[in-house]
């Protein structure tokens, strides 16, 4: 499990993450909320940006994670700082929760449809952060979320998680569907990359991931 607290003049974020879907908690909610504790998968996302909450809930659900993420951001300006900082904080938590990349596949890929939309995601726990995100979104906003911030969120996450990711929406006419299928595909890819191999080794011919 990982816990991250990030406080700047633009955002106040805290999150708890368990990549195996175990119990997670925060000592005190910055939003004054109470979360029931349990042994099963727990997901509570409150960023102040509804569609971002929806995407992160899908990512956690299909990735098999337990996640509590709270953010108070300067949304009176716009959504940029909130979305970017949530990506940074989630990436930091992911890296901590993942730990040493030993005895796992390292590479993963996933496809996810949502009605007419189909997305593909490929990831590498390479310790070499890079993100290519091509979603082909046409709307300026989906709900309260600027569509330009969706790839930026994923880029921020990849940078702090120190993973390589390629996320592409292959087809689709509805931007909500295109985005959601992309996050679900990413969840599937990450879950596959974490699959144990049964060997206690670093999955690299170099012997290190760098």
From Swiss-Prot:
UniProt record, GO biological process: L-histidine biosynthetic process
Pfam families referenced in this protein's UniProt entry, alphabetically: IGPD
Top EC class for this record: lyase
Top-level lineage group: Eukaryota
Single GO term (MF): imidazoleglycerol-phosphate dehydratase activity
The protein's annotated pathway: Amino-acid biosynthesis; L-histidine biosynthesis; L-histidine from 5-phospho-alpha-D-ribose 1-diphosphate: step 6/9
InterPro entries: IGPD_sf (IPR038494), ImidazoleglycerolP_deHydtase (IPR000807), ImidazoleglycerP_deHydtase_CS (IPR020565), Ribosomal_Su5_D2-typ_SF (IPR020568)
Amino-acid biosynthesis among keywords: yes
Signal sequence interval, chain numbering: none
Record keywords: Amino-acid biosynthesis, Histidine biosynthesis, Lyase
Recorded catalytic activity of this chain's protein: D-erythro-1-(imidazol-4-yl)glycerol 3-phosphate = 3-(imidazol-4-yl)-2-oxopropyl phosphate + H2O
The protein's Enzyme Commission number: 4.2.1.19
Family under the similarity heading: Belongs to the imidazoleglycerol-phosphate dehydratase family.
Protein name: Imidazoleglycerol-phosphate dehydratase
Organism listed in the record: Candida glabrata (strain ATCC 2001 / BCRC 20586 / JCM 3761 / NBRC 0622 / NRRL Y-65 / CBS 138)
